[in-house]
Amino acid sequence: MYTREQLIALVQDHAATHETYPFNKTNSHETIIWTVMKHNASNKITAMIFEREAVLYLTLKLTPDHVDEMIKTRGIVRAYHMNKRHWITIAVNATDATKQEMLGMLAESERLTK
């Protein structure tokens, strides 16, 4: 089981990223806190971390073929808030994807966002 802080650290340990919070409004009633991990070189979004209804999510960019393959895995869906052809969202603590698979997808997302 990962916490938000552990997931942020995992992403930073395995991808050249920095965290930003561009979608969070201080005067909003929005309860979802978005942690956007941007590639250090390109400043493009590499990963997004958020929680909704006590579920921790990680959004990553993959090739379209890899997206089609991974959405067959429990706990992985097309990212509703991104281009669904290229992005997936993983329910981190409720997926059948292994840590190694998630790290592989993170590496792919980092490569695609350079």
What is each PLM-predicted segment?
Residues 1-114:
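Charge-dense, helix-prone N-terminal extensions
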